[in-house]
Regions:
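Positively charged n-region of N-terminal signal peptides that target proteins for export
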Residues: 1-4
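Aromatic-acidic/polar surface patches that form glycan- and anion
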Residues: 6, 34
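Bacterial N-terminal signal peptides
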Residues: 9-20
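N-terminal targeting signals for Sec/Tat export/insertion, comprising classic cleavable signal peptides
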Residues: 36-60
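Boundary at the C-terminal end of the N-terminal hydrophobic targeting segment
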Residues: 23-32
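Compact alpha-helical subdomains of small soluble proteins
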Residues: 52, 56-128
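Residue-level detector of functional hotspots within protein domains
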Residues: 31, 37-39, 87-89
Length: 128
């Protein structure tokens, strides 16, 4: 009898969790159109050949910066609803030190990643 009660409660909990999971997941992630913009921004970072990315005093190649941004986006998925959220909450500054991420181009120019990504967002929004 006790085992039956435990199993009943267990399966009721699973059923309840399964019922709320889809709505929870959809409420947590960005809409498809915004995800498309974020993916386009990340692609722009990856396409910056010969550029260097600076984060907390360390230098990274574009491919490494892309992997980092994807991981940080995934970790902060619940907070990122728009491409602008991605720029502001993920791709602009270190959550640890607060220091801005920087991009140094081949010609030596340096820009904050936030400025670069906002400019890129203005270019891609009309296309998407």
């Amino acid at each position: 009898m006790k085992r039956r009660l435990v199993l009943t409660v267990f399966f009721a909990c699973i059923a309840m969790f399964a019922a709320i999971l889809p709505s929870f997941a959809s409420a947590q992630s960005a809409p498809a159109a915004e995800k498309q913009k974020i993916e386009a921004l990340i692609k722009q970072v990856g396409d910056l050949k010969h550029a260097k990315f600076f984060r907390n005093g360390w230098t990274y190649e574009p491919a490494t910066a892309v992997r980092f941004l994807r991981g940080k986006w995934e970790a902060n998925d619940a907070e990122v609803k728009t491409a602008r959220d991605f720029i502001d909450k993920v791709a602009s500054a270190s959550g640890t030190s607060g220091k801005p991420y920087l991009i140094r181009f081949k010609d030596g120019r340096e820009i904050k990643s936030q400025e670069f990504l906002l400019a890129e967002l203005k270019k891609i929004e009309p296309k998407l």
